[in-house]
UniProtKB/Swiss-Prot annotation:
<dbReference type="InterPro" id="IPR035439">
    <property type="entry name" value="UPF0145_dom_sf"/>
</dbReference>
<comment type="similarity">
    <text>Belongs to the UPF0145 family.</text>
</comment>
<protein>
    <recommendedName>
        <fullName>UPF0145 protein PF1756</fullName>
    </recommendedName>
</protein>
<dbReference type="InterPro" id="IPR002765">
    <property type="entry name" value="UPF0145_YbjQ-like"/>
</dbReference>
<dbReference type="Pfam" id="PF01906">
    <property type="entry name" value="YbjQ_1"/>
</dbReference>
């Protein structure tokens, strides 16, 4: 099975060393809203009383970032891109124990410089 994240170049910079942007396809984006569940909330509450990292939420947000990134890559491929430049994550609290993670960047077609 091919890992979708291996099929496209994703960078936080406006250019990719060794590559030339030949076409801009538009904004690639992918988002997910994750809700906590009772088990995580109880563990988080106990950790909050004690202090320190809330590992249950850290794990949940890491999973959400991976899924948002995967969705952005799928969108970039649908746009006909083989790379995404200026990649970023954005997060927001939706309320009710939910958080949105949004991945976005500029979908482009690149070719190796000669």
């Amino acid at each position: 099975m091919v890992n979708i994240m291996d099929e496209i170049i994703v960078v936080t910079t406006p250019t990719i060393p060794g590559y030339k942007i030949i076409e801009v396809k538009g904004i690639a984006r992918g988002g997910i809203v994750m809700a906590t569940h009772l088990g995580r909330d109880i563990l988080a509450l106990l950790r909050n009383i004690k202090g320190g990292e809330v590992k249950e939420y850290t794990q949940m947000m890491a999973e959400a970032r991976e899924e948002a990134l995967r969705r952005m890559i799928e969108h970039a491929k649908k746009l006909g891109a083989n790379a995404v430049v200026n990649f970023r994550f954005a997060t927001s609290n939706v309320g009710g124990g939910m958080a949105e993670v949004y991945a976005y960047g500029t979908a482009v077609v690149v070719e190796r410089e000669k």
